[in-house]
């Protein structure tokens, strides 16, 4: 689509953000295919990850640092984290993740590893991965949730009981999905946005556990979308922020510094 790692790193630099590339771990999207790369053929994929770190951070006398400099950016991009796999799951994923993690930590111990917890925030697959990834001491467990507004309202206290030690949480993809029978332009509504806002109170209250979060997807064209709802809609003349965008803006521009307890009938309220 005309956006490679170089352009992505430049974009992050321009807007003052930290880049977080997510790399293929040798497994196809498990929604669509069971294809995977055999373990004895995984080395090229691992080398791609190592080369990417060198491209982002390496001195100009390294192979990939020299290529970056030749492209016009001699200074390093200061990459600090990398994701291995997206919504992958099962023992096959853990096996491949272990190989990536060993190689990356051996050569670049300062790079943080973000690992997938699959497609769902509950169930046997999630429980298996959550336990396995924490045993591996990955830096972040990437949790995704596309759920109805009621789920977000009832899960504002989800992270209250999470352990404060070990792997942190990256809420890497989330959005409240209202009635699927609604047209695309009506799925970004205040019901969804308010439930996300309530859920975010729990993330902010547990910021020592959930250290990163990102709504998804970010952009969609009103006449050429594949997924809805989306945070920002565009046409050839306008950019329209959804109700969910207003929630993201509210939290981005008004960072909380204190958690104030609210109780009803002697019980602490959340969400």
Residue ranges and their predicted role:
Residues 67, 156, 228, 262-263:
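Residue-level detector of alpha-helical recognition elements and their boundaries
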Residues 118, 146, 263:
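Histidine- and/or cysteine-centered catalytic micro-motif in compact active-site loops
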Residues 69, 75, 101, 188-189, ...:
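Intrinsically disordered, low-complexity segments enriched in polar/charged residues with Gly/Pro
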Residues 257-271:
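Surface beta-strand/loop "capping" patches
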């Amino acid at each position: 689509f005309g956006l490679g790692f170089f352009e992505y790193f430049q974009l992050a630099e321009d807007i003052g953000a930290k880049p977080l590339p997510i790399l293929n771990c040798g497994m196809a999207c498990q929604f669509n295919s069971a294809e995977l790369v055999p373990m004895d053929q995984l080395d090229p994929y691992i080398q791609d990850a190592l080369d990417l770190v060198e491209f982002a951070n390496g001195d100009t006398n390294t192979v990939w640092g020299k290529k970056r400099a030749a492209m016009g950016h001699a200074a390093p991009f200061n990459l600090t984290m990398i994701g291995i796999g997206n919504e992958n799951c099962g023992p096959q994923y853990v096996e491949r993740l272990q190989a990536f993690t060993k190689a990356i930590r051996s050569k670049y111990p300062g790079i943080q590893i973000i690992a997938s917890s699959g497609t769902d925030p509950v169930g046997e697959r999630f429980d298996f991965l959550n336990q396995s990834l924490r045993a591996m001491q990955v830096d972040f467990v990437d949790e995704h949730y596309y759920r109805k507004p009621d789920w977000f309202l009832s899960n504002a206290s989800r992270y209250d009981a999470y352990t404060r030690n070990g792997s942190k949480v990256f809420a890497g993809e989330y959005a409240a999905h209202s009635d699927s029978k609604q047209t695309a332009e009506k799925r970004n509504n205040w019901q969804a946005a308010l439930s996300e806002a309530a859920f975010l109170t729990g993330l902010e209250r547990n910021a020592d556990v959930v250290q990163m979060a990102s709504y998804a997807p970010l952009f969609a064209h009103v006449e050429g979308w594949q997924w809805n709802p989306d945070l920002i809609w565009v046409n050839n003349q306008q950019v329209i922020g959804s109700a969910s965008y207003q929630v993201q803006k509210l939290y981005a521009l008004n960072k909380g510094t204190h958690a104030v307890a609210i109780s009803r009938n002697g019980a602490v309220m959340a969400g």
